[in-house]
């Protein structure tokens, strides 16, 4: 009976701790090459469920590779995760200690005080990995963040949006690139974006 009560209390206490910072999630890093480094993952898109996928990625990076990972979300006025609120990013202060940023954002219009945390992090020269809609992470002029930082903004959908799938093929000569370690040709039930990468871009997959 004591063991059952102890187990129940542990689960209840763990749930309480998770709710104590319910505007963001932090996974402490275990042992691995990323030990001592902090990755901040920014979710905020209306189509690709970054609020679900990025916590999964953060857990993998923390448990298998040792990185401390913090996931930030778009919230509504009730404090609930709401990717349609383009003006919100929870706990932006986490960016102040970021060693890298992974982002899946779309058309965000954050307040200036939130932008400042992001700008300061980028201006430190830390790596930024942009996924899918991050080419148009922020609503603004053509040639903005996507083009200047990631190498391309939004151009068009290649294939029928929400109707066709795609196949990704590893670029010839890129097979041994460490980024592709363990990766083979891929298939996705989604169309892709048309892009015109910079002349000095290294293409790993088409």
Regions found by a protein language model. Name each.
Residues 31-35, 93-97, 121-124, 172, ...:
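Extracellular/periplasmic catalytic domains that process cell-envelope and extracellular macromolecules
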């Amino acid at each position: 009976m004591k063991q059952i009560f102890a187990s129940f209390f542990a689960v209840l206490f763990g749930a309480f701790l998770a709710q104590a910072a319910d505007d963001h999630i932090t996974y402490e890093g275990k042992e691995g090459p990323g030990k001592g480094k902090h990755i901040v993952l920014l979710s905020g898109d209306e189509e690709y469920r970054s609020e679900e996928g990025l916590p999964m990625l953060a857990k993998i990076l923390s448990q298998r590779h040792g990185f401390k990972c913090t996931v930030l979300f778009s919230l509504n006025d009730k404090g609930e995760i709401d990717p349609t609120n383009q003006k919100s990013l929870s706990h932006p202060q986490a960016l102040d200690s970021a060693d890298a940023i992974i982002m899946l954002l779309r058309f965000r219009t954050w307040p200036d005080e939130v932008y400042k945390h992001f700008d300061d992090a980028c201006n430190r020269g830390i790596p930024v990995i942009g996924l899918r809609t991050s080419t148009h992470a922020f609503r603004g002029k053509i040639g903005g963040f996507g083009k200047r930082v990631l190498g391309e903004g939004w151009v068009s959908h290649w294939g029928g949006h929400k109707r066709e799938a795609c196949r990704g093929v590893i670029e010839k000569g890129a097979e041994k690139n460490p980024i592709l370690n363990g990766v083979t040709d891929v298939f996705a039930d989604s169309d892709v974006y048309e892009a015109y990468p910079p002349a000095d871009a290294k293409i790993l997959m088409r």
